[in-house]
């Protein structure tokens, strides 16, 4: 029986938990959260899912156990301000073979290097859950645009740029193979807004980036309205338009005389994605999420300029990243 631990049973953590119910391997699952209310909600969500191939062993506890048995897979789904501390505590308490971290990874620059060294020391293979690259429609985009210079445009209302820009920068890195980029914050609205999660901030306006291979990214979050998220990717050889809310996308390619064709673009929920990720990791020792070292680089190239922009436009000066 494989041991799986989830730390943080809030919105995203409980979705990871739901996904584990369908994993076709016998699991011993421990859910850890300081809030008994969150644990109760997570348990209810887990029990609401269809019965899987195996009835997994379940435990719900409020703290990390010291000197526990080796863990096959841990998923840390806390907020960014607690994740480095929790990761350190876990790795000092048990041998963890595989680890999935949520984004935004951490809220302090120093944590990125410190946790990276700890992961090497403990030989813990680690990925970051930025799942566009494992969603079928976005995975296939790599076939259309691989190693090309692309234009990548996303628009929509209330996207939450601090939270979600990392998804798109990671996807561009996945498509193009280029991980070096610079962002331009001049199009952001100067005053940040409160994020959905208490104590964190968000940006509206337009955030742009230029990758080393010449690819350009433009992400626009309208502060009002209900404009759906539309993703447009184009190169000299292909054009892609995706409407996530409808599960639809259209593709035109030069070798098809630029004729538009509708393609399937269903976006699977986290409660299904994690099922496949867990099965792949436990059976093969790998998955298609971005690995920690690469994601650390992609994170910091975004977070440092955002912090500088925030300090330039705020009376309060931030030494950390108030994003999650």
Whereabouts are the PLM-identified features?
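N-terminal Rossmann-like dinucleotide-binding module
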Residues: 1-51
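Amphipathic, non-transmembrane alpha-helical secondary structure
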Residues: 14, 18, 65-66, 84-92, ...
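C-terminal helix-rich "cap/oligomerization" subdomain common to oxidoreductases
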Residues: 26, 45-46, 73-76, 279-324
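Short acidic low-complexity segments
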Residues: 53-70
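Beta-strand-loop-alpha-helix segment that lines the small-molecule cofactor/substrate pocket
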Residues: 72-80, 84-133
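Rossmann-like NAD(P)H-binding beta-loop-alpha module
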Residues: 136-151
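Rossmann-like dinucleotide-binding domain that binds NAD(P)(H)
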Residues: 151-228, 293
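NAD(P)-dinucleotide binding in Rossmann-like oxidoreductases
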Residues: 197-200, 212-278, 286-293
């Amino acid at each position: 029986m494989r041991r799986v631990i989830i730390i943080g049973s809030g919105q995203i953590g409980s979705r990871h938990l739901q996904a584990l119910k369908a994993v076709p391997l016998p699991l011993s699952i421990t859910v850890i959260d300081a809030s008994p209310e969150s644990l109760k909600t997570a348990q209810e969500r887990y029990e609401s899912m269809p019965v899987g191939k195996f009835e997994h062993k379940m435990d719900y506890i409020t703290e990390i156990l010291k000197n526990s048995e080796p863990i096959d897979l841990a998923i840390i789904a806390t907020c960014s301000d607690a994740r480095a501390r929790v990761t350190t505590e876990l790795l000092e308490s048990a041998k963890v073979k595989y680890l999935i971290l949520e984004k935004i990874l951490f809220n302090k620059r120093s944590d990125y290097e410190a946790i990276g060294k700890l992961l090497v020391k403990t030989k813990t293979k680690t990925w970051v859950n930025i799942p566009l690259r494992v969603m079928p429609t976005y995975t296939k985009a790599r076939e259309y645009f691989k190693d090309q210079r692309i234009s990548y445009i996303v628009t929509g209302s209330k996207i939450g740029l601090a939270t979600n820009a990392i998804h798109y920068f990671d996807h561009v890195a996945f498509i193009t193979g280029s991980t070096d980029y610079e962002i331009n914050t001049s199009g952001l609205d100067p005053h940040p807004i409160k994020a959905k999660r208490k104590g964190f901030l968000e940006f509206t306006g337009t955030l742009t980036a230029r990758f080393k291979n010449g690819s350009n990214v433009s992400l626009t979050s309208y502060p009002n309205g209900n404009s759906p998220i539309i993703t447009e990717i184009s190169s000299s050889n292909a054009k892609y338009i995706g409407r996530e809310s409808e599960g639809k996308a259209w593709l035109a390619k030069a070798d098809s005389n630029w004729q538009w064709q509708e393609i399937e673009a269903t976006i699977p929920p986290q409660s299904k994605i994690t099922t496949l990720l867990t099965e792949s990791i436990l059976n093969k020792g790998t998955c298609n999420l971005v690995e920690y070292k690469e994601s650390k680089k992609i994170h910091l190239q975004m977070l440092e300029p955002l912090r500088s922009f925030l300090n330039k436009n705020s009376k309060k000066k931030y030494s950390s990243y108030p994003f999650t």
